[in-house]
Amino acid sequence: MRNIYSIYKEHYKALISLGLPIVIGQIGVIVLGFADTLMIGHHSTIELGAASFVNNVFNLVIIFSTGFSYGLTPIVGGLYGTHQYASAGQALRNSLLANLLVAFLLTIGMTVLYFNVGNLGQPEELIPLIKPYYLVLLASLVFVMLFNGFKQFTDGITDTKTAMWILLGGNMLNIIGNYILIYGKLGLPEMGLLGAGISTLFSRIMMVVVFIIVFMRSPRFLRFKLGFYRLGWSKAIFGRLNSLGWPIAFQMGMETASFSLSAVMIGWLGTIALASHQVMLAISQFTFMMYYGMGAAVAVRVSNFNGQGDILNVRRSAYAGFHLMMALGVVLSSIVFLCRNYLGGWFTDSTEVAAMVTSLILPFLVYQFGDGLQITFANALRGISDVKLMMLIAFIAYFLISLPVGYFCGFVLEWGIIGVWMAFPFGLTSAGLMLWWRFHHKTKLPPSIQNS
């Protein structure tokens, strides 16, 4: 054990140093999600059900678009690892354009969905609440994509603190805005769920504005700004952003789609089940976002070493990340387990919702291993720019395994919401195992290194 620690010690330190600011930034996102759910839930259980539906739909779109922006990380990470700073700045310029185009396409698709939202089998009483909230979140999509472009760039150059501070500030602004607009403080009208949406839109706009100001004015970005301004557009970089970004987007999108489509199925069970699902999603995002921070650090480290052609440290960075991910999973799962009987009551006054939340803790705990496994090795594969097979893996794991199992357990066996949630461990663990095998196969060490 001591020998293993000595081998991975430097990687542990580097990953924690890189990942901790990302994790702290994600804690801000988690706190925002909790605050949203708490404030909306205590304002109205019906509004909580409406928020659950809309947030699930937009989580799919936002994670899909975030996945596309991840294509920048291995490009910038490789350039930064070989000291090509001007080219890294040029990559950012091209990434912002690509992200804007993707945001435009997604906005068109989501507008079409808006006009058909009444045909998705949701409870009739939720539709008047769903529609205005949906439109406000739709308006914020372009700002999410611009923020992601800057964030993936700064992560790729190992500056994870800038995005952390901007995220924390934006989320604090969002929480304050929620309180004022949901409950009608400072002389403003009580807007409920719509107020939460307006607050989210405003905070996302401000985060982009602040990121632009920091990039333009901070001296530490000077060597990158030369390439950003002077090297212009690059067909090669733009093409590579698309060849990397789309497979990652579809891989992440299919994972999220399994949760979003599960929310549609849960909506068939009624408002109480949908509200319970929203509470559990807020809790599950607590662990996912923490894993995400460490996974992003793995992608950066792997891309840096991959740019240098150092396969040994590519592998060690990935496995060190997995060790840390599992340790984090044990800690987080223990916290959730110890608080299992209180979680539902923190989010809503409804005893029915609180009881249903407690019943979902077991499937939640079971899938933590699979979630940590798939996040680690999906990011490791992104770091080595091996992303195309991830789409097939995601399709098998989430559409051929997770969704059918969820429908079978939830509706054929009549286990209800617990049955739908029992599918998540199957999908995430199967995805993790396939992604691990792909990474293991693609990073085999030469015999000379193996022997040494």
Give residue spans per PLM region.
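Short alpha-helical transmembrane segments in multi-pass integral membrane proteins
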Residues: 1-19, 76-142, 188-245, 302-367, ...
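Hydrophobic residues within alpha-helical transmembrane segments
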Residues: 20, 24, 54-57, 97, ...
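Transmembrane alpha-helix boundary and packing residues in multipass membrane permease domains
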Residues: 22, 26, 37-38, 74, ...
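Short runs within selected transmembrane alpha-helices of multi-pass transporters and secretion channels
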Residues: 69, 137-155, 163-171, 196-211, ...
